[in-house]
Amino acid sequence: DWNARFTFAELEDQLAKMAETYPDITKLYSIGTSWQERDLWCLEITNKAIPAEEKTGIGVFANIHGGERESASSAMYTAWWLTLCSDNDYVKGLLDSYTIYVIPVINPDGYEQSFVINNRPNLRPRDANGDNIPFSDPYADIDGDGFIATLYRGKADDTPSRELPVFGMESPDWDGNGILGDDPRTSGIDMNRTFDYQWDRYDIETKDGQQIGNVNWTTAGAAPATEPEIKALQQFMYENKIDALATLHTGIQSVLYPWCYRPYDENDPDDAEIPFMKEIAAQMA
């Protein structure tokens, strides 16, 4: 049921089932672990009878932002479709020519946390309020309405919330410092900013200083590739032949192609394939 929202454990079970059902075209393995020691699973899909060096490697990576659970579902759907339709002549041709590496959840800790509250970062332990206890003032659904609310200071009238100062997040103030939810279960690190290429070049959210208390919601981290999830992903890409890569998100309805940090330069050899990528992106959109 692709309309369902699966837990990370359920996704693990689905991956294992695909690998068990289609052993001739799949291989399931972990490329590393998260801060909370959840596996970063990769389902490799290809015709194993044909040598890997004769094929093009395609990466389908998803859920680097924990709350974007639908991106994981899209990656899982890709794996499901390729395996289910592997007897189809068209799909057979794909698996003869390509090795597809599907990593549906890059941020498993953030994925699980997002069932409590939408959480973009991973769960590197963080002491945001300085009491020497990581995550000592997490959010909680105090009123039991099924939502964790942002709290604003002001009168309960028709004033738009965007015009009111933020008081905190729904929390019983576990640490007793008068600031609600100022040490939540979040690292504040956006792992999509932490790769060692173009690290922190355009860390827009950080530069805007979006904070509650002293918590920056999205930063590039203290240094390039500080997070175990990103270290594992980069090492995987170094060790495998990845010729093309699709990273799946849910933030906007668009298809992005290189380069997002500078304009296209027709005289730059690195940009020779950009017109082709633009054409493919237009077809996908």
Q: What would you call each of these model-derived segments?
A:
Residues D1-A285:
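M14 metallocarboxypeptidase catalytic domain recognition
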